[in-house]
Amino acid sequence: MSDWNPSLYLHFAAERSRPAVELLARVPLENIEYVADLGCGPGNSTALLNQRWPAARITGIDSSPAMIAEARSALPDCQFVEADIRNWQPEQALDLIFANASLQWLPDHYELFPHLVSLLNPQGVLAVQMPDNWLEPTHVLMREVAWEQNYPDRGRESLAGIHAYYDILSEAGCEVDIWRTTYYHQMPSHQAIIDWVTATGLRPWLQDLAESEQQLFLTRYHQMLEEQYPLQENGQILLAFPRLFIVARRTE
């Protein structure tokens, strides 16, 4: 599991794209020229940006070679760069920085977010969506299984919180619109939940394990999911998935 798997990620493409659609709908910009899609993945969010602003110069940034290759194949009219978001520098100031489900993987948001604001033109917008599920059973159980099986903590940090992000971005000279939404995804089985998180949140926990260790981890994880997520009357499972949204417009 040395690289991200675009096919596995796109298995739940509709569910993963819905927050991007809803974030984009709140971006208060019309005619813009320079756009960056940070953590563009296989290009599903970049495609939405390209549809809204077909004349804009859109650059997708991702650290995964596999994701960049998939995005280039899907969107030949857009530019894609393999780079670390923290180190990438645009050639010109940006009108929009769009980051759908990517910045949660990076540390030091107290430094990262002001840095991203500094890359914007005056009146430019930083639009961010981040999964806020660190305390959801899906992610709590990852940590519990790792502790049971004596594996080191590989999970990402929790988010800073709504009030912290408001202060960070206000102090960086932005007008801030911030909200939190919980989606309830209908899942056909507990294995489907594992398939979902294996492409993203579970990946760091598994990537350094031998195949036999991965199977032990996943077997125990499946057992614990069954305890935490009961079946509905129709046999479906409702997977709660909170997400934090931020639209910050630079005013300084």
From Swiss-Prot:
Catalytic reaction annotation: trans-aconitate + S-adenosyl-L-methionine = (E)-3-(methoxycarbonyl)pent-2-enedioate + S-adenosyl-L-homocysteine
Keyword Nucleus included in the entry's annotation: no
GO cellular component terms, semicolon-separated: cytoplasm
Any one GO molecular function term: trans-aconitate 2-methyltransferase activity
Record-given protein name: Trans-aconitate 2-methyltransferase
Pfam family, one: Methyltransf_25
Native organism: Escherichia coli (strain 55989 / EAEC)
Localization per record: Cytoplasm
SUPFAM superfamilies linked: S-adenosyl-L-methionine-dependent methyltransferases
Keywords carried by this UniProt record: Cytoplasm, Methyltransferase, S-adenosyl-L-methionine, Transferase
UniProt EC number: 2.1.1.144
Family label: Belongs to the methyltransferase superfamily. Tam family.
Protein's UniProt keywords contain Transferase: yes
InterPro entries recorded: Methyltransf_25, SAM-dependent_MTases_sf, Trans-aconitate_MeTrfase, Trans_acon_MeTrfase_C
